[in-house]
């Protein structure tokens, strides 16, 4: 329990009283509680899919959540995060930019690589934003957020012909053993790709139950045999009793 409380404090939830019931938490609070549960679980060789962990966070707390996500990665796991916060982009070992715009003009892989090179991609709205804000941050701050170097992938998950909502026949490679951030403008199809196609696809390959009710289609998935399990962390309530509290 002491270790769990340490994680809760680390993600800015030190103000929660232990008698507070889970169903009374906000979406952002519930998601961060779920993250602390995962961080203290000692799971390894697991793919963690996290949808916008910075949602509802004060800027001062974003770095704390980034630290927890990096701890999960450093324990021997793969983390795929849907995010747009600059601090997450800086911390990423690998970035996937979905776009180039929203709706019918989205759902395509615009860029795959490290954060630094994304700023030079003219087609990417995220890249243009990064280029415009580059002067606000020093190189040392960037390095501190990510670490001394980008981690190299120990393998790849290859998802082909993903289709759901705005995502049409999109083929993407996800690096294993690193922190991979999936970014792009709102409505580009980030969550559709990750939550509604990638996560269910891996669940199917691993013969693991899937918590997503409506799933997309895909042509194939390679590399799932390199991971042991997959976990989705979003804003849905944790499974368990309505009387569960943040410490349990």
Predicted segments with their positions:
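Conserved phosphate-binding elements of NTP-dependent enzyme cores
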Residues: 1-248
């Amino acid at each position: 329990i002491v270790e769990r409380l340490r994680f809760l404090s680390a993600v800015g939830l030190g103000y929660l009283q232990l008698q507070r019931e889970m169903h009374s938490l906000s979406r952002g609070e519930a998601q961060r509680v779920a993250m602390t549960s995962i961080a203290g679980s000692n799971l390894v060789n697991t793919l963690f899919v996290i949808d916008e962990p910075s949602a509802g966070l004060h800027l001062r707390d974003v770095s704390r959540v980034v630290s927890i996500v990096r701890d999960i990665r450093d324990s021997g796991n793969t983390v795929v995060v849907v995010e747009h916060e600059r601090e997450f982009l800086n911390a990423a070992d690998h970035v996937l930019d979905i776009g180039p715009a929203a709706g019918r003009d989205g759902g395509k892989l615009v860029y795959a690589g490290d954060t630094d090179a994304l700023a030079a991609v003219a087609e990417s709205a995220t890249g243009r934003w990064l280029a415009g804000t580059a002067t606000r941050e020093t190189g040392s701050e960037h390095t501190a957020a990510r670490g001394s170097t980008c981690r190299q992938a120990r393998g790849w998950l290859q998802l082909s012909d993903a289709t759901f909502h705005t995502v049409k026949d999109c083929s993407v490679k996800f690096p294993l053993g690193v922190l991979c951030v999936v970014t792009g403008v709102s409505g580009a199809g980030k969550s559709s790709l990750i939550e509604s196609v990638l996560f269910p696809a891996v669940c199917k390959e691993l013969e693991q139950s899937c918590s997503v009710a409506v799933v997309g289609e895909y042509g194939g998935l390679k590399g799932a045999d390199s991971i042991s399990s997959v976990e989705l962390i979003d804003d849905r309530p944790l499974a368990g009793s309505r009387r569960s509290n943040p410490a349990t």
